[in-house]
Amino acid sequence: MGIVMKKMVLVAAVLAMTAGSSFAADMAVKAVKAPPPAPFDPWDIAFGSAIMNDYVFRGVTQSNHKPSVAAYFEPRYNINKDVQLYVGTSFESISFPNRAAAEVDIYGGIRPTFGMFAFDFGVWGYLYPGGTCFNANAFPGSGLPGSSAGCVANADPITGGLPINGNFAKKDASFYEGYAKVNVTLNDMFQIGATEYYSPNFLNLGAWGNYASITGKFTAPSSTFGSSGIGMYVSGEFGRQWLGTSDRFYGTQIVGQIYQFGIPEPSYNTWNIGVGFTYKVFTLDFRYSDTNLSKGQCNAFTSDFTASSASPANVSLINPGGFGSNWCGATGIVKLSADLTAATNLK
């Protein structure tokens, strides 16, 4: 009986140790259990600023080839990980023919993503407050859009300050565009895309505008600059800006001339290519931009207030004065920007 009792005690001890080990193991697993995931926060805000030596929009300088600053603020709402709603506003310093104080943009849209395809649909409004009208023919009762005594007075090259090039400018150049964009991420290094913008009254010229482009981007491997955290990319765009016929304000005003009551605004091609370097929230971009507009076509399209010399080579039915503008030619752009989001950078 003594031997049997000893065996029973030994078995009981082993069972107790085994049970204790299992319980301890369970306790250990429970002790390192991952915490529940943080609740999904659909709201975010993107914001940033930039400084550049020249503000160029679709191949045409908006700052008279002078430095410009910009800033933006964009609240976002993520319906889910693949659909984002957004609204935003931005500010750019400019030097426009109508002497507008600044460019103020208001925009909004939706960004759905399907795998490698990222879409963007929205409406963009371009506002140019503080402008002045210049047109010696836009006297009250002339029938020209935006006519006023001020238009005539401002157009005087002595008292109004307009160079003696005869160019016209409406007080308000504001307009809006609807747009659709797609970006295709082929892999970690290559992206291609396409854009489409349409306005029924581009730059308030009275002419419709349609812009379409194709884009491409190569992002260098993250190891290109070792462990420095510096990134690099090369990107480019080729686009076409189509334009309709202006209203009477921008006609040649030459009695009997075919374009007296409005000119066919010159459609054109534009392209840019550049290289950029990124570090944390900063991007330094070096870019070349150009168009196929002649100096005479550029003057007719932009009403460049700095155009001061005429040439027979620039004379045409839409530019009878023969003045030429360099606002649409080849230019180099250096831009330093900072881009942040609340979800990523403010936590």
Language model: regions and residue ranges:
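Residues that define the transmembrane beta-barrel architecture of outer-membrane proteins
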Residues: 43, 65-71, 100-104, 172-178, ...
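Transmembrane beta-strands of outer-membrane beta-barrel pores
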Residues: 51-57, 89-95, 112-114, 125-129, ...
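Short glycine/proline- and aromatic-enriched beta-strand/turn motifs that initiate or cap beta-hairpins
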Residues: 26-30, 37-78, 88-95, 341
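Outer-membrane pore/translocation modules
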Residues: 62, 91, 97-211, 317-324
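Outer-membrane beta-barrel "beta-signal"
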Residues: 324-347
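Cleavable N-terminal export/targeting peptides
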Residues: 1-42, 341-347
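Short loop/turn motifs that connect adjacent beta-strands in outer-membrane beta-barrel proteins
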Residues: 33-44, 78-86, 98, 113-120, ...
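Transmembrane beta-strands of outer-membrane beta-barrel proteins
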Residues: 45-49, 71, 85-89, 106, ...
